[in-house]
């Protein structure tokens, strides 16, 4: 099936869905697989061009993350090349190293398991099941976050102080990177898994989300570099790239708005921030499984 079977309305809808769910801890890939199946859309999910099309949308998401965190990336870039003030260089290089450490596990594991995961990508019931698992993972992170903190707790088990992003160690980054590998399974959220990894290392929601969104950029760009060439050489009808470009813009705008909302949300609701997303994933996943089974 050729990619032209996805009409413009479907492409824009998938783009908006991608832009929001890539950052929200609810699994963008899981939604991209499950929702079309629920709506009865005949999308080319079994085509070699479907995943590259989704990654093309990731390019819009990556642009949104780069624009939103441009100060962070400029500080890192200028520090790494020694262009920043001397007292900023060591910290910039240290954080850059942490980003590299956190990114490597997903690159290695993804490279080893790519073909098996491709089969999982095509199955809406499996993605719906792991959406439920994702909800449980988020609840697990919230439940155990206090036990992982080196700081004292109050009588109601709320942590009185949390670690900031600047305190991350190499082991913190590696642990978060290992958690990111779980998101290679459709239905498991990359941002959710990495935020949980940060919480279990005693980092607060806002700092965990900040680091999660920073390491998202190289992962998304890496996936784009690997997949988009396949799209360029696929059997694609005229006009598809115009539709894909429009969809990428829609995904980018949605991703920027989602990032702005989430950074404020995680800052203002540190004691229970993941719970609403957890309940949503469990209910949505169970509902999708029931619909796919009985419909």
Curated annotation (Swiss-Prot):
Q: What class of enzyme is it?
A: hydrolase
What's in the keyword line of the UniProt record?
A: Antibiotic resistance, Cell inner membrane, Cell membrane, Cell shape, Cell wall biogenesis/degradation, Hydrolase, Membrane, Peptidoglycan synthesis, Transmembrane, Transmembrane helix
Q: Which reaction does it catalyse?
A: di-trans,octa-cis-undecaprenyl diphosphate + H2O = di-trans,octa-cis-undecaprenyl phosphate + phosphate + H(+)
- Does the record's keyword annotation contain Lyase? no
The entry lists its GO molecular-function terms as: undecaprenyl-diphosphatase activity
Q: What is its EC number?
A: 3.6.1.27
Q: Which domain of life is it from?
A: Bacteria
Where is it localised? Cell inner membrane
Recorded hits in Pfam families, A to Z, give:
BacA
* Regions crossing the membrane: 12-34, 50-70, 95-115, 120-140, 209-229, 243-263, 272-292
* Topological type in the membrane: Multi-pass membrane protein
Q: Does the keyword Transferase apply?
A: no
- GO-annotated cellular components: plasma membrane
| GO BP term, pick one | cell wall organization
Q: What is its main location?
A: membrane
Q: Which InterPro entries match?
A: UppP (IPR003824)
Q: What protein family does this chain belong to?
A: Belongs to the UppP family.
Annotated HAMAP family? Undec_diphosphatase
Further information in the entry reads: Bacitracin is thought to be involved in the inhibition of peptidoglycan synthesis by sequestering undecaprenyl diphosphate, thereby reducing the pool of lipid carrier available.
- Name the job this protein performs: Catalyzes the dephosphorylation of undecaprenyl diphosphate (UPP). Confers resistance to bacitracin.
Spell out the protein name for this chain.
Answer: Undecaprenyl-diphosphatase
Which organism is this protein's natural source?
Granulibacter bethesdensis (strain ATCC BAA-1260 / CGDNIH1)
């Amino acid at each position: 099936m050729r990619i032209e079977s996805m009409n413009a309305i479907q492409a824009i809808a998938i783009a908006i869905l991608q832009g929001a769910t890539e950052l929200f801890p609810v699994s963008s890939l899981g939604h991209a697989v499950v929702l079309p199946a629920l709506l009865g859309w005949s999308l080319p999910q079994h085509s070699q061009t479907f995943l590259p099309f989704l990654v093309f949308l990731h390019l819009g998401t990556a642009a949104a993350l780069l624009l939103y965190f441009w100060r962070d990336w400029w500080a890192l870039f200028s520090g790494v090349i020694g262009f920043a003030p001397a007292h900023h260089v060591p910290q910039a290089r240290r954080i850059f190293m942490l980003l590299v450490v956190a990114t490597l596990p997903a690159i290695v594991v993804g490279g080893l398991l790519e073909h098996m995961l491709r089969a999982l990508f095509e199955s809406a019931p499996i993605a719906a099941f792991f959406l439920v698992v994702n909800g449980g993972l988020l609840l697990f992170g919230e439940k155990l976050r206090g036990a992982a903190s080196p700081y004292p707790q109050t009588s109601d088990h709320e942590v009185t102080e949390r670690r900031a992003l600047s305190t991350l160690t190499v082991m913190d980054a590696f642990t978060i990177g290992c958690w990111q590998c779980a998101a290679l399974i459709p239905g498991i959220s990359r941002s959710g898994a990495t935020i949980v990894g940060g919480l279990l290392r005693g980092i607060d929601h806002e700092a965990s989300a900040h680091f999660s969104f920073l390491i998202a950029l190289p992962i998304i760009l890496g996936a784009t570099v690997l997949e988009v060439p396949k799209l360029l050489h696929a059997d694609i009808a005229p006009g598809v790239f115009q539709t894909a470009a429009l969809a990428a813009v829609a995904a980018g705008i949605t991703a920027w708005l989602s990032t702005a909302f989430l950074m404020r949300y995680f800052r203002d609701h540190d004691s229970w921030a993941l719970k609403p997303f957890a309940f949503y994933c469990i209910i949505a996943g169970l509902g999708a499984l029931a619909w796919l089974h009985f419909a």
